[in-house]
Amino acid sequence: MSQLDSAQLPNEANEVGEDGCYVGLTHDKLDVQRTMDRVRSPEAGAIVVFVGTTRNSFDGKPVKELNYTAYNPMALRTMISICKAMKTKHGLKGIAMVHRLGVVPISEDSIVIAVSSPHRQAAWRAGEEALEECKAKVEVWKREEFEGGEGVWRANRDGAPGQRIDTAEPAVGAGSGGEIDD
């Protein structure tokens, strides 16, 4: 194989798979079926999938799009740690978590989490818990772009306070998945 730089292999450094756990960060559209297939097992009686999409408003303000950014090495470590914990705690056969980065237009997918388990109850619980852990801990931030040009960076979780800014980058020291001060 010829030597290629990392820019020619963008997904190589943006995904990790081990012990029935798969995580990824990508600028491409998410492939829900591919994510489900990563957790499929003949020992599983249930696969639960969560797909988060960009909605068209936040707090009554029309949203144009979301723009996600991440500290990839740390985000991947946190994501795989969450997946391993969920797999052990809930007795899962597999778990996959893929987050989109960059611009995500209205109605497009920003995150896919798939879990497989012998029984549906564990799959439901694990899927929801994995999402909440991801939103609370993973080093991914989003900028909500509103109609009219205003934008707000906020931690990647519901109800997190935002900070109106004029630049296209999050504040330095914004924290590891934590809130950005008003």
Curated annotation (Swiss-Prot):
Transmembrane segment boundaries: none
GO molecular function, one term: molybdopterin synthase activity
Entry's localization field: Cytoplasm
Entries under SUPFAM superfamilies matching the protein: Molybdopterin synthase subunit MoaE
Superkingdom: Eukaryota
Database matches in Pfam families: MoaE
Region (Disordered): 152-182
Known EC number: 2.8.1.12
Database matches in Gene3D superfamilies: Molybdopterin biosynthesis MoaE subunit (3.90.1170.40)
InterPro entries recorded: MoaE_sf (IPR036563), MOCS2B_euk (IPR028888), Mopterin_biosynth_MoaE (IPR003448)
Keyword presence, Cytoplasm: yes
Gene Ontology CC annotations of this record: molybdopterin synthase complex
Pathway: Cofactor biosynthesis; molybdopterin biosynthesis
Keywords, alphabetical: Cytoplasm, Molybdenum cofactor biosynthesis, Transferase
Residues annotated to bind substrate: H119, R120, K135, K142, R143, E144
Main EC class the enzyme belongs to: transferase
Reaction(s) this enzyme catalyzes, per UniProt: 2 [molybdopterin-synthase sulfur-carrier protein]-C-terminal-Gly-aminoethanethioate + cyclic pyranopterin phosphate + H2O = molybdopterin + 2 [molybdopterin-synthase sulfur-carrier protein]-C-terminal Gly-Gly + 2 H(+)
Quaternary data: Heterotetramer; composed of 2 small (MOCS2A) and 2 large (MOCS2B) subunits.
Annotated protein name in UniProt: Molybdopterin synthase catalytic subunit
Source organism of the structure: Pyricularia oryzae (strain 70-15 / ATCC MYA-4617 / FGSC 8958)
Source organism phylogeny: Eukaryota, Fungi, Dikarya, Ascomycota, Pezizomycotina
Gene: cnxH
